[in-house]
A protein has these predicted regions:
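Hydrophobic alpha-helical transmembrane bundles of multi-pass membrane proteins
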Residues: 1-183
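Positively charged, low-complexity/disordered segments
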Residues: 182-193
Length: 193
């Protein structure tokens, strides 16, 4: 085995392990949310988190990954929507040339679990306050917002061009949430100002 193949395997293994660890955060946030609500809603919360992660995964596969990491401009990616298995197995090739040290599938897995966990952070504030369809709509919209923000920082966007580095994702995850909450607050408060 060549050293480059060994390095690729090690990088891929590490990214997949990290993605699995981030996925476990979903369970942690579900437990936190269940602990903050009445006991009769605990099963509803667990099921909701699984369903919304599914919605997030589908939206991120169909549109979000292309917006975040597809070739495009400094605001959003304009290619690579609904990636095929073959395109995700390539390393460092268009439209996902951002992933130069791991296959696109490993990068996709890592990014989709981050999009899902950023949604789970928000759900704690919405527990017992919304109907199930609201979670679906909010989850799809938030996944798109997360995709745009991740393109700005990680996908070669305008913040990346300014030299911004975000290794752990705190800027992308938190700023996506803040933009969404800001839009909601502005729409509710604007008639009163």
């Amino acid at each position: 085995m060549k050293s480059s193949d060994l390095l690729l395997a090690a990088n891929t293994l590490w990214v997949v392990v990290a993605a699995v660890l981030v996925m476990f955060m979903q369970a942690g946030f579900a437990f936190l949310e269940a602990g903050l609500t009445r006991m009769k809603n605990a099963a509803h919360i667990a099921g909701k988190n699984v369903l919304i992660f599914g919605v997030c995964s589908l939206v991120y596969w169909a549109v979000g990954f292309g917006i975040a990491f597809g070739d495009g401009n400094s605001v959003l990616g304009t290619s690579g929507f609904a990636p095929s298995v073959d395109s995700l197995l390539a390393v460092g090739q268009a439209p996902y040339s951002f992933f130069t040290t791991v296959p696109g599938a490993a990068g996709y897995l890592f990014e989709v679990v981050f999009a899902g966990v950023s949604l789970a952070i928000v759900w704690g504030a919405m527990a017992e306050r919304a109907k199930l369809w609201v979670y679906f709509v909010f989850g799809a919209a938030f996944t798109l917002i997360y995709s745009v923000t991740s393109h700005w920082v990680w996908g070669g966007g305008w913040l990346f061009g300014l030299g911004m580095q975000d290794f752990a994702g705190s800027t992308v995850v938190r700023r996506s949430e803040e933009r969404r909450v800001g839009k909601e607050c502005r729409s509710r408060w604007s008639p009163y100002h």
